[in-house]
Amino acid sequence: MKEIWDPKKIATSITREIQALAVLFQVCLFLFGGILGICLLLILLLNEYTRILAVLYIGWAFILNSRTPSRGGYPQALQIVRRWNMWRYYCDYFPIQSVKTTDLDPKDNYIFCYHPHGIMGLGAQGNFCGEATGFSEKFPGIYPHLLTLSMNFNVPFIREYTLSAGVCSVDKGSIEYILTKMGPGHSVIIVVGGAAEALEARPGSVKLTLKERKGFIKLALSNG
């Protein structure tokens, strides 16, 4: 007679569902986060009881802290999203792993290049927006800053979520600030193919878009 109720199978099934929900959460943010953020801000502005909060948020986020994405992002104490347990389930879904091949001197600053971009850069998020793959344990004293397009910081509320994951702007000034002004160990991760490479994403095919994207090499040389 077959065992109908198997605790191990049930636990595995529940864990797998949680993993799928973690990935779905990130995918939904990518697809609908911009619309949701704008709609939420409009709702707050139109409501007389929350209007002042919306105005204060706009002033704080887009005036007082408008340069934060290009100035190293949030300090580590405010990088709340990086500490979420969600990233463990997110990475286990695929699974996503990081493999250490050498030690890195924490006295230096580094430019890491990530490939492939894929459609949404899911691997980069899993490795560098949280600690699920053990980056800080493998490279103590190295502080990773995943970089993305500056336009992604124009979306209300999603902007704060992104900054709380330790993400910064990928513009030249931002990279130079992190490498030269934030101290030893602060390093950047550039998805070198960018949005152009995302358009080349196909199942079973990995293409590197690099020919017209060599600015990071110049930055590496100029910052020694």
Where in the sequence are the language-model features?
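Short, charged cytosolic
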Residues: 1-8
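A residue-identity detector for tryptophan
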Residues: 5, 60, 84-87
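Alpha-helical bilayer-embedded segments of polytopic membrane proteins, i.e.
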Residues: 8-62
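Short, isolated positions within intrinsically disordered regulatory regions of eukaryotic proteins
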Residues: 9, 64, 88-91
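FNR-like FAD-binding dehydrogenase module
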Residues: 12, 69, 105-106
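Interhelical loop segments of eukaryotic multi-pass membrane proteins
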Residues: 53-55, 69-80
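Short secondary-structure boundary segments
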Residues: 60-73, 176-181
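Soluble catalytic domains of membrane acyltransferases
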Residues: 78, 82-85, 89-224
